[in-house]
């Protein structure tokens, strides 16, 4: 028994979880088990849970101990006890009640099944988008729904046999004259034989159509039709062209779906259920609050309705001879609706409710959503070596770095710090090392920073919808309690700085650290894996910052000077509005302008004149200056809208100044450094080994 449980949770044996289709034989294998006396159990046939007097599970019910195992380890329903795993104890099951003497944990994974009296459609593959059954059968969804819920009949094609019905496909038996004309030619039994032979409805008709599909022929025919549509030229009619485009997209989806079925060895008819799995009892518990009160899972109540309706349909099909067809069809529809409520309550209309008008919680509700089993229990559970905090912007960080608060870092990397303290003989044992960490000695932070320089961490923001939701960073210690993040990586996380929280995880094994370095670093995930567009692009706060940085007095000097709102900026001591150099300073280079800003002599958006090397061919010859100022030495200034030319007496160009702001200078320098770094990296990659291009 211990080996059986260890194999269930072995991480090397079970490394992934996949939701997909299984065959009825596989469901039977999961559920059936052979008792030591040769009896086969596993089918749930009774809609009962516990006996109201003995408070024990009903035999062949939803909590049957013969099917799902004992409630208490080694104790059968009769109360007898056997030592688990003792081969000397014989027999290994109770001959009176048929319960095996095994560990009670078996009730957490042992499944049962319900043998359906009539095939039932799996609603996920019919109503969810995209509808796989619609894609395979190439029929409208409303027609298939009418067929599944017994609103239409399907005329069966019978090969090499004489048929009464010459039509093929759907027929509405209830409205058309078939209902009154066909039975005239038959007796009651003969008509039942004819109807079962040439007409079908419900999930059985869908199952028959899916079983008759040839997936390879579907691929061939779809490919031929797609090529024919591709060769057609546009008609000019927008509606017709869109219709052709939708048909081509449908054919591509159909071919991909057929290829997937062939590649995974899945048969399409498995989308119609003949055996309905019953979850283990521990996953749908029932609790006793008081002596008279029980609290049970909604899934148990839905299972009970399914068993009631299935047993009723079985009786109608087997025991009753002259049962009206309408009654059988109605019961098949009720069974289909009950299974729909179990899988996805409310997807097909009005949801199933209890006596207090409360909607039952289906399997889809248990699995999906933020509070579902996957996101809350499997993905959102607390794990060791992980933390969580609010994110704030870190504009000075490199793209592959993040700021980790000291309080979080010392907790996550405490084991690593203790190891290094002992290895460097700074602490004699673990207790002394922990004492130094509690006292926050300076040597602790030095060792911690050394560890962080070579150990990546993983940052994750829920929900993790694609692989860029988890990325690797090299952490640096920061003050405060918030995680600092570079704004360029926010798009991959779909994060912003309005209170979002992110989780930090420490990869422990060498394999995990290698994967983080080779595949998950943020500077290695610059493009979207789906469409190839840049994922590290300025958004939100960065765009606002760039706007503020370059939103100084960007308009030309003429517009600013003669604008009444800006006249006070140019008014001099003589109360006129002519140009004066005192208002807008001149700088020989960008370093002088930055120095003046640091000395608080100018502002970030203040207009200024910067000496610039400008190609004279760029200057328009026909452009006339706005003003010309002459100096006492003969030099003069030609002032244009966005630049200024200093000429000598001989009209030679001495200097050229451009009108800009300090924000534009900062942005230009960043772009220039980035281009130079990119060019240097490209040159180094093309040069032979040992030769490198130095900056400058």
From Swiss-Prot:
Q: Which SUPFAM superfamilies match?
A: beta and beta-prime subunits of DNA dependent RNA-polymerase
Q: What class of enzyme is it?
A: transferase
Output the GO biological process annotations, alphabetical, semicolon-separated.
DNA-templated transcription
Q: Sorted alphabetically, which InterPro entries does this protein's record hold?
A: DNA-dir_RpoC_beta_prime, RNA_pol_asu, RNA_pol_N, RNA_pol_Rpb1_1, RNA_pol_Rpb1_3_sf, RNA_pol_Rpb1_clamp_domain, RNApol_RpoC1
Keyword terms, alphabetized: Chloroplast, DNA-directed RNA polymerase, Magnesium, Metal-binding, Nucleotidyltransferase, Plastid, Transcription, Transferase, Zinc
Q: Which residues does the annotation say bind Mg(2+)?
A: 496, 498, 500
What EC designation does it have?
2.7.7.6
> Where, per UniProt, does this protein localize?
Plastid, Chloroplast
Tell me where on the tree of life, at the top rank, the source sits. Answer: Eukaryota
Query: What does the cofactor field's note say?
Result: Binds 1 Mg(2+) ion per subunit. Binds 1 Zn(2+) ion per subunit.
Q: Please give the catalytic activity noted in the UniProt record.
A: RNA(n) + a ribonucleoside 5'-triphosphate = RNA(n+1) + diphosphate
Q: Record's GO cellular component, any one?
A: mitochondrion
Cofactors per UniProt? Answer: Mg(2+); Zn(2+)
Oligomeric form and interacting partners: In plastids the minimal PEP RNA polymerase catalytic core is composed of four subunits: alpha, beta, beta', and beta''. When a (nuclear-encoded) sigma factor is associated with the core the holoenzyme is formed, which can initiate transcription.
Annotated HAMAP family: RNApol_bact_RpoC1
Q: What does this protein do?
A: DNA-dependent RNA polymerase catalyzes the transcription of DNA into RNA using the four ribonucleoside triphosphates as substrates.
Q: Which family does it belong to?
A: Belongs to the RNA polymerase beta' chain family. RpoC1 subfamily.
Output this protein's name. Answer: DNA-directed RNA polymerase subunit beta'
Q: Which organism is it from?
A: Guizotia abyssinica (Niger)
| Encoding gene, per UniProt annotation | rpoC1
């Amino acid at each position: 028994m211990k080996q059986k449980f260890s194999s269930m949770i072995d991480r090397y044996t079970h490394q992934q979880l996949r939701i997909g289709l299984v065959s009825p034989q596989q469901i039977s294998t999961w559920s059936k088990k052979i008792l030591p006396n040769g009896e086969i159990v596993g089918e749930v046939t009774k809609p009962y849970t516990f006996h109201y007097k003995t408070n024990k599970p009903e035999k062949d019910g939803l909590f049957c101990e013969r099917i799902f195992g004992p409630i208490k380890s080694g104790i059968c329903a009769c109360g007898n006890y056997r030592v688990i795993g003792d081969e000397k104890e014989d027999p290994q099951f109770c001959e009176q009640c048929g319960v095996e003497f095994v560990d009670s944990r078996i009730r957490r994974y042992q499944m049962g099944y319900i043998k359906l009296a009539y095939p039932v459609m799996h609603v996920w593959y019919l109503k969810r988008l995209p509808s796989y059954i619609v894609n395979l059968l190439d029929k409208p969804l409303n027609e298939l729904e009418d067929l599944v819920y017994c609103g239409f009949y399907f005329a069966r094609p019978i090969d090499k046999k004489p048929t009464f019905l010459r039509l093929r496909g759907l027929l509405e038996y209830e409205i058309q004259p078939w209902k009154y004309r066909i039975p005239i030619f038959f007796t009651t039994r003969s008509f039942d034989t004819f109807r079962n032979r040439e007409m079908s409805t419900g999930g059985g008709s869908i199952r028959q159509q899916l079983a008759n599909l040839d997936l390879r022929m579907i691929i061939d025919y779809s490919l031929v039709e797609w090529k024919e549509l591709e060769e057609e030229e546009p008609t000019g009619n927008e509606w017709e062209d869109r219709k052709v485009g939708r048909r081509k997209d449908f054919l591509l989806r159909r071919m991909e779906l057929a290829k997937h079925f062939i590649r995974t060895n899945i048969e399409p008819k498995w989308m119609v259920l003949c055996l309905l799995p019953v979850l283990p009892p521990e996953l749908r518990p029932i609790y006793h609050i008081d002596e008279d009160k029980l609290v049970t899972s909604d899934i148990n109540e839905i299972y009970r309705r399914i068993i009631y309706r299935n047993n009723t349909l079985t009786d109608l099909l087997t025991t009753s001879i002259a049962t009206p067809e309408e009654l059988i069809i109605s019961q098949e529809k009720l069974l289909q609706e009950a299974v729909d409520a179990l899988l996805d309550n409310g997807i097909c209309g009005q949801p199933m409710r209890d006596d207090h008008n409360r909607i039952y919680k289906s399997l889809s509700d248990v699995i999906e959503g933020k509070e579902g089993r996957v996101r809350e229990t499997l993905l959102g559970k607390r794990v060791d070596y992980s933390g969580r905090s609010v994110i704030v912007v870190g504009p000075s960080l490199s793209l592959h770095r993040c700021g980790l608060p000291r309080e979080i870092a010392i907790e996550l990397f405490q084991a690593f710090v203790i190891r290094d303290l002992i290895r460097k003989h700074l602490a004699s044992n673990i207790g002394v090392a922990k004492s130094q960490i509690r006292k926050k000695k300076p040597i602790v932070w030095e060792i911690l920073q050394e560890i962080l320089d070579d150990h990546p961490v993983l940052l994750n923001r829920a929900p993790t919808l694609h692989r860029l939701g988890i990325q690797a960073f090299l952490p640096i210690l920061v003050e405060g309690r918030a995680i600092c993040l570079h704004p360029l990586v926010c798009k991959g996380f779909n994060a912003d700085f309005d209170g979002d929280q992110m989780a930090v995880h420490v990869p422990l094994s060498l394999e995990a650290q290698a994967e983080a370095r080779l595949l998950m670093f943020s500077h290695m995930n610059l493009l979207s894996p789906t469409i190839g567009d840049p994922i590290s692009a300025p958004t939100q706060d960065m765009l606002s910052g760039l706007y503020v940085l370059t939103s100084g007095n960007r308009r030309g000097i003429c517009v600013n000077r003669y604008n009444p709102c800006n006249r006070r900026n140019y008014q001099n001591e003589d109360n006129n509005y002519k140009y004066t150099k005192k208002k807008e300073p001149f700088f020989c280079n960008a370093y002088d302008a930055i120095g003046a800003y640091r000395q608080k002599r100018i502002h970030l958006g203040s207009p200024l004149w910067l000496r610039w090397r400008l190609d004279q061919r760029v200057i328009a010859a026909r452009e006339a200056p706005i003003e010309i100022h002459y100096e006492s030495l003969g030099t003069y200034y030609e002032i244009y809208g966005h630049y200024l030319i200093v000429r000598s007496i001989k009209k030679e160009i001495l200097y050229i100044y451009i009108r800009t702001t300090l924000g534009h200078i900062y942005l230009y320098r960043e772009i220039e450094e980035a281009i130079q770094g990119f060019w240097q990296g490209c040159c180094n990659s093309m040069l032979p080994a040992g030769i490198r291009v130095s900056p400058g």
